[in-house]
Amino acid sequence: MSNWLMLEGDVCAVTGALGGMGTEICREFARNGANVVMLDLDEEKVKAAAAALSEEFGIHAEGYKMNACNEDEVQAAVDATIRDFGRVDVLVNTAGILRFSPMEDLPLSDWNDVINVNLTGTFVASQRFGREMIKAGKGRLVHISTAASYSPETFSGVYSSTKAGVNMLSKMLAAEWGPYGVRSNCVCPCFVKTPMSASFYADPEVEKSRSRLIATRRIGEVTDIANAVMFLASTRSDFTTGAEIMVDGGFSNMMGDLTAKPGGRRAFAENYLKNKGVDLWTDVAGVKTPSDQ
């Protein structure tokens, strides 16, 4: 167990705790001696996951059912946290969903679903847990955003839009709650292996091709994201608030949206346009990428 982060004994709540990224963040908190509040939709599974975490790391972990879009469930989770732990020091918002569609075909129901989970859910959880932090005069909020909140990702417009909203929400919380001792920051991943992106990397050639587009020449792991979250969740980052930290292997500094990204959204875009008789690179971009030559 490392003491450098000084997280030992802190109470750290994580939404979307049963997802690949959320689970690893919970485990990393536990490795550093923090007590963990796991929040997710499946009550039975989240309670079992918390019990396993407690047994493995010897910390206090609890799992509570929580839909971040439901104010009553969020408040119940806050009340349970205060009842069982006495306080909350950290909230990490990882809960999120993704829908692929060209904007002209995106159903309003999909738009509303993604907005509700990714943006409204982040707001409600931050507001309710944040009130307890304001009372205590200290607290740290960390929100999982994406590099696509800066650069458009074709056919993931609603996802990118919500995450851009999360970035601004984080800045507003940082500005308004800073005087109360509460900090708010975002982590912006890209090209990371998670259950949500598993289908992208099922083909080894896709992973190999995508790796060539990244400065570090490898696809990210959930541990890469968890490590960045640990820093922002700790008092080691006490002078950092309202920030967005890119954790993307340098991709966002190297490439724009017209870079070919084999598999996943790019393949979806290429196939969609191909069916309409349009070649993405010659007819739309007017270029051929190195991988096409």
Task: Please place each PLM-identified region on the residue numbering.
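Canonical Rossmann dinucleotide-binding motif of NAD(H)/NADP(H)-dependent dehydrogenases/reductases
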Residues: W4-V37
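Active-site loop-to-helix junction immediately N-terminal to the catalytic Tyr of the SDR YXXXK motif
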Residues: L98, L106, P152-S160, M172, ...
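Substrate-binding pocket helix/loop in short-chain dehydrogenase/reductase
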Residues: P102-M103, D110-I115, R210
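Active-site helix of classical SDR
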Residues: S126, T162, S170
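Alpha-helical segment proximal to the catalytic Tyr-Lys
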Residues: R131, A175-P179, D238
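Residue(s) in the substrate-gating loop at a strand-loop-helix junction
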Residues: T146
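C-terminal helical subdomain
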Residues: C186, K208-T240, I245-G249, K276-Q293
